[in-house]
Amino acid sequence: MRFKGLDLNLLVALNALLSEHSVTSAAKSINLSQPAMSAAVQRLRIYFNDDLFTINGRERVFTARAESLAPAVRDILSRIQSTIIKGDLFEADRSERVFRIISSDYSTSIFIRGVISAASTSLPLLRFELISPDDNCHDLLNKSEVDALIMPEIFMSSAHPFVPLFEEKMVCVGCARNHEDRNISSIQEYLSMRHVVAKFGRGMRPSLEEWFMAENGMRRRIDIVVQSFSMIPPVIQGTERIAIMPYRLVEHFSKFMPLKVFALPFPLPRFTECLQWPSIATPDLGNRWLRAYLADHASQMMILDSAEYSGASI
């Protein structure tokens, strides 16, 4: 099938090549033989009058023309997928769709696990794939390779829509056995204590609390750096170290280990956990259902938490 001289099947081949960065892998991803894929690449080069890529050692380097085509091709194919192939109906109780969600250890522990538990009872055919956020999570969003991303608002991409799910506060926590009778009475005392901090991804991105400390000129003695908030409670057990982490996650871990929340002589920041999705998935009925389902569960969680959320003792 041709449209103004372009064989539309070649768009599928081009998208696979741009996604896989390998002729062999691209061929496998769309069930073509390697000779057929190589022939498609040659036809694409002729149509666009461009090499599309060159080989530099073992690395495949795309041309500027190929790079410029990538988002448009992804957008076209994703729109076909969401508006034509999937049809006009989405029945959650009958669907076997797999929803791919980027979710941190924090959001999985205090929010997504409840969502999945509820779905497993009433919507047993639905499946979920949870992906840990890393430095390329926005690339997955740009390529529409995930259905949703759940992270704090400060990490939201400006290229896609998002909505707030719930608000969270940060608290200072330590081992209850080692800090049974201790309070923190001054900023100087807090800064002089030994700290554990969380940084994220290969780039070791600082957490919200680190930005807060830097903006307020607070320099702490950092003994240990971990890559998730969930690593903090085990690390501080049996020590005098303290850390700052989300309150709901402290509540979660306090069921398994002794934790103490300290009142600090200065306010800690709050953050808003948000839901983001690929912009081209906005009209997709399945994605619309997922967004509503997540928002409804977030609302229910806030209602259940409201009575005890204002306190900071565990």
UniProtKB/Swiss-Prot annotation:
Tell me the keywords, alphabetical order.
Activator, DNA-binding, Nodulation, Repressor, Transcription, Transcription regulation
Domain of life, per the record?
Answer: Bacteria
**Listed InterPro entries:** LysR-type_TF, LysR_subst-bd, NodD_PBP2, Tscrpt_reg_HTH_LysR, WH-like_DNA-bd_sf, WH_DNA-bd_sf
HTH lysR-type domain residues are 6-63
* Protein's UniProt keywords contain Metal-binding: no
Coiled coil spans: none
Question: A Gene Ontology molecular-function term?
Answer: DNA-binding transcription factor activity
Entries under CDD domains matching the protein = PBP2_NodD
Regarding protein family, the annotation reads: Belongs to the LysR transcriptional regulatory family.
Function description: NodD regulates the expression of the nodABCFE genes which encode other nodulation proteins. NodD is also a negative regulator of its own expression. Binds flavonoids as inducers.
Which protein are we looking at? Nodulation protein D
This chain's source organism reads Azorhizobium caulinodans (strain ATCC 43989 / DSM 5975 / JCM 20966 / LMG 6465 / NBRC 14845 / NCIMB 13405 / ORS 571)
The gene that this protein is the product of is nodD
